[in-house]
Amino acid sequence: MPKKITALIKLALPAGKATPAPPVGPALGQHGVNIAAFCKEYNARTTEKMGLIIPVEISVYEDRSYTFILKTPPASVLLANAAKVKKGSATPNRVNVGSVTKAQLEEIANIKLPDLNTTEISSAIRIVEGTARNMGITVSD
C-alpha cells in the first residue's frame, strides 16, 4: 500500500544555498521532516544551477519521510539574467529596464516548457514574452 501524503510544501530556494534557517526550517519542522538532511540533498541536487532560484515541491508522508521535485527557475529570474537587470520595472507600461532577443526568449521558453501548461514551443514563447512585458523588458529581433 502506498504511503499517505500528509503535507505538500512549496518553497522557492536559492540553488545550492538552502539552510535550516527560515523559510526552510519552520516550513519543514512543523511537519517533522529532518531539515538538515533535506538541505544537504537539495544543495547537492542544485549545485550546477548556482545563482538561480529553484522552486521545490516537497511531499511529506505520514511516517515523516519525504520526497521532493525540483521545478524550473521562475521565468522572471531567467529573463532578468538574460536582460542583465536586477529586477523588473515598477511601472512596466512606462519604463523599460532592459531588452532580450527572440533567441533568448526561445531559450528561456525551452527551459520552462516542462513546467508550463502547454506542449508547444510557440505557446511557451508567448507565455514568456508576456512575463517579459510585465517586467518592463522589451523583446527585440
Curated annotation (Swiss-Prot):
InterPro entries: Ribosomal_uL11, Ribosomal_uL11_bac-typ, Ribosomal_uL11_C, Ribosomal_uL11_C_sf, Ribosomal_uL11_CS, Ribosomal_uL11_N, Ribosomal_uL11_N_sf
One Pfam family here: Ribosomal_L11_N
Entry keywords, A to Z: Chloroplast, Plastid, Ribonucleoprotein, Ribosomal protein, RNA-binding, rRNA-binding
Recorded GO MF terms: large ribosomal subunit rRNA binding; structural constituent of ribosome
Keyword Nucleotide-binding: no
PROSITE patterns recorded: RIBOSOMAL_L11
GO cellular component, one term: mitochondrial large ribosomal subunit
Gene3D superfamilies hit by this protein: Ribosomal protein L11, C-terminal domain (1.10.10.250), Ribosomal protein L11/L12, N-terminal domain (3.30.1550.10)
Protein localization: Plastid, Chloroplast
Keyword Transcription: no
SUPFAM superfamilies to which the protein is assigned, alphabetical: Ribosomal L11/L12e N-terminal domain, Ribosomal protein L11, C-terminal domain
Cross-referenced SMART domains: RL11
Example GO biological process: translation
Superkingdom assignment: Eukaryota
Function comment: Forms part of the ribosomal stalk which helps the ribosome interact with GTP-bound translation factors.
Family per record: Belongs to the universal ribosomal protein uL11 family.
Subunit record text: Part of the ribosomal stalk of the 50S ribosomal subunit. Interacts with L10 and the large rRNA to form the base of the stalk. L10 forms an elongated spine to which L12 dimers bind in a sequential fashion forming a multimeric L10(L12)X complex.
The protein's name: Large ribosomal subunit protein uL11c
Taxon lineage: Eukaryota, Sar, Stramenopiles, Ochrophyta, Bacillariophyta
